[in-house]
Each structure stands twice: as structure tokens, then as C-alpha cells.
Amino acid sequence: MSATSTIDPAEVAKFEAMAAEWWNPHGKFKPLHQMNPCRLDYITEQIAAEFDRDLSAPLPFQGLRLLDIGCGGGLLSEPMARLGADVVGADAAPRNIPVARLHAEQSGLTIDYRNTTAEDLAAAGERFDVVLNMEVVEHVADPLAYLTACRELLKPGGLMVCSTLNRNPKSFAMAIVGAEWIMRWLPKGTHDWSKFITPDELYDLIRKAGLDPVDRKGMVFNPVSWSWSLSDRDLSVNYVTASVRPR
């Protein structure tokens, strides 16, 4: 029996319609491809710090079980597998899973991709050292229930990395007007600005879910270099957080 779900069917349908585009760096997921190096820098730094891993080692994350929730086509799952993690990629959109499986197979990677939800994984007793929760929380129907399921998925002392979009006039101008309406990097309607979450709101939700926030940084786009970088101060549009489940 399926656990109570926070999945928003309309949000899932948006990403199902774009499933074949995941590994096209010039397609509908171009913004994620551009952002990915910045996301990976933050994720790897946080995992290395939390679990005392040497990133110069051949497989620094060997022995860590990692869940990439809302994995899409595997843009984060694959780099984590290359670093040695035992990766489960989960997505509520059924069409994303065969795309992710095929690309992993072509890349010579072993990744356990599943069409499932955080709630169902938690109900099944699955537990992980790391949960990646990237650009998902703004698409769910009940953020607190969803984050609570993510906490249940973590082993004591486990790490959750969560990224999302701030809610303010600047984020509307850049993420909605700029990215969807003008530049057409994403189809119109990909994001619902009213579902964006401020950093303080997210910290409050994370604490209510039973996790301890330990870090947050902005992810800032430079339109001149067309690259992303981490910022300690600018969380005005995209930002990322790290939280741990108490031991």
C-alpha cells in the first residue's frame, strides 16, 4: 500500500513531458546542466566535511548510501556514483526512469533507479547516509510532510542537501519572467512562484521536520560568463542548504 504522498500530479506531468530532454545540454534542461557544476561543488564539499572524506581519493564516497530524490535523468546520481557512492535515484515521473537507466548503462555505471516517492521509500524502511533533495521542494504539495519523509530516510547523523528558489520580486523576474518568458530556457509554467520558499521559511520547515540546519549558500548566475558560483551572502534567487539528522 502506498504511503500518503506529497506528490503534486500536475508538477509531475510537467517533467514527464520533458523526459527525453534530460541529457541534452542545449535543451529544456539547459539551466540545470549549467548549474550542475556549482551544485556538485556544494554537495561534495558538504558530504566530505560531514563524513570526513578525502576528495582527492579515487572513490571518496565509497561505503556511503545516497538517495537522489527527484533524480530526473540522473544529472546528480551519475557523478555521485562515479565518486563511489551506492546510489538510489528516485523519481515520481515514470518516464524519467528508463531515460536515467539507459544513460547510466551507456556510461558504465550501476545506479538503482526507481519510480517511487520519498514517502513510499520511508514507509518501506529504506535508510541512507545522504539524501539529495535538489530543486524538488518547490514542486510538492506539502513541503513539511515531504521534508519529514526525507528526515525519516536519513540514518542518525545523516546529511540532507536541499536546494530551491527564494520567493521575492527578483526571483520572479529571473526565474519566471527571464528564464521562462523571455529566454525560454524552460517551458512556461515550469515553476509556480507562489511555491517558492524563502531561506528562513525553509530553515523553519527543516527544523520542524526534525533536522538541524548546518549551512546555506546562494547559487548565483553570472550572465557574462554564463556560469554559476556559490555565495555566502547572495541567497536572493537560487540557494542550497545542508542539514543533519541528530544522532
UniProtKB/Swiss-Prot annotation:
GO molecular function: 2-polyprenyl-6-hydroxyphenol methylase activity; 3-demethylubiquinol 3-O-methyltransferase activity; polyprenyldihydroxybenzoate methyltransferase activity
Annotated keywords: Methyltransferase, S-adenosyl-L-methionine, Transferase, Ubiquinone biosynthesis
EC number: 2.1.1.222, 2.1.1.64
Transmembrane segments: none
Reactions catalysed, as given in the entry: a 3-demethylubiquinol + S-adenosyl-L-methionine = a ubiquinol + S-adenosyl-L-homocysteine + H(+); a 3-(all-trans-polyprenyl)benzene-1,2-diol + S-adenosyl-L-methionine = a 2-methoxy-6-(all-trans-polyprenyl)phenol + S-adenosyl-L-homocysteine + H(+)
Amino acids binding S-adenosyl-L-methionine: R39, G70, D91, M134
Domain of life according to the entry: Bacteria
Enzyme's top EC category: transferase
Short name of one Pfam family: Methyltransf_23
Pathway where it operates: Cofactor biosynthesis; ubiquinone biosynthesis
Any single GO BP term: methylation
Homology family: Belongs to the methyltransferase superfamily. UbiG/COQ3 family.
NCBIfam families for the chain: UbiG (TIGR01983)
Purpose: O-methyltransferase that catalyzes the 2 O-methylation steps in the ubiquinone biosynthetic pathway.
Alphabetical list of PANTHER family matching this protein: METHYLTRANSFERASE, UBIQUINONE BIOSYNTHESIS O-METHYLTRANSFERASE, MITOCHONDRIAL
Record protein name field: Ubiquinone biosynthesis O-methyltransferase
Origin species: Cereibacter sphaeroides (strain ATCC 17025 / ATH 2.4.3)
Gene behind this protein: ubiG
